[in-house]
Amino acid sequence: QVAAVLGNVVVVVPTVVLLSLGISLALGHPMISEKEAEYTLHSLSLLGPTLLFAAFTGCLLFASSIVAGWAENWFVLQRLDSAMRYNPRITGLLGTARADRWAHFMRHNISGFASNISLGFMLGLIPAFTAFFGLPLEVRHVTLSAGQLAAAAASYGLPALTMPALWWAVAAIPLVGALNLCVSFYLAYQLALRAHNVSGVQRSHIHTAIRQRLLRKPFSFLIPG
């Protein structure tokens, strides 16, 4: 997950900057106005409620994983891979070999599709729903926040490097990523303990083992073995 987050950020930031520069050259104005850039920097600032929103977004990430698990279980329970593989209409349209490849592909990727689609809907719709009810609740996903930050910085150009607001927003990005992952993993961990009926004594042993691993090999939580 750490590698995935870093990979997303490393790709998103230069892509957004290049896209903004391309729009500036083609249309004569940046992708977002300076007023919008100023709002973006202040909304992402470490001095604001960004970390609270990041923790809330971690809950949404956990919810999307629940949707993914449900979708995969439903796919397997209904034997949809077999239906795709042997359905006469599908095999007639795609051919036997291609239908088999599609069935295999969907069996191994249905959870990813369900997770990404449900997360996209939640990230886009929940702030609108909460705003309708007067709740100023927003989302702070590390990849989206990094892209917004890059767009705001590109709007100002090189003078952005002298702006304190930019660096307060930059400082928030790693913490946003950490909260996204930690909150979602914590909720998943608690669910796993309940699902397996892990007793209090067993939980204490697990917590002790985690603490010992954290003290002895802290980087093993960040770098794949």
Which residues does each predicted region cover?
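Long, compositionally biased intrinsically disordered regions
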Residues: 77-225
